[in-house]
Amino acid sequence: MLSPQKTRFRKQHRGRMKGISYRGNNICFGKYGLKALEPAWITPRQIEAGRRAITRKFRRGGKIWVRVFPDKPVTVRSSETRMGSGKGSHKYFVAVVKPGLILYEIGGVTENIAKRAILIAASKMPMQTQFIISG
């Protein structure tokens, strides 16, 4: 699973996912991509599930670029805990996704195969996405 080797701080504020993505919203490496249309948090398991779905569809050939990385720590309080007594313990990392961000890029395959692979990966994502072609 994806997670940062080191973090500067162990815990972070939740923050708000307002606005659109101004960075990482263009296709840079491949020819086809999967673009987010809604804000969401994506877990490493969801990223890996999407990547595996794409590679399975390729069989041989083609290249995948994963453009998101989970770097935000999420804390969880144990159930039936009273209010107060500090922030919960670290549970997992998430990638913060804003509308317009490219999640995956694909190259070296035909448009038909790329579209099928991307649509399968899109079904694993927790938000609305769109298949896009560079050009």
UniProtKB/Swiss-Prot annotation:
It comes from the Eukaryota. Coiled coil: none annotated. Keywords: Plastid, Ribonucleoprotein, Ribosomal protein. It is found in: Plastid. The keyword Ribonucleoprotein applies. GO terms for molecular function: rRNA binding; structural constituent of ribosome. Part of the 50S ribosomal subunit. This is Large ribosomal subunit protein uL16c. It comes from Epifagus virginiana. The lineage of its organism: Eukaryota, Viridiplantae, Streptophyta, Embryophyta, Tracheophyta. The gene is rpl16.
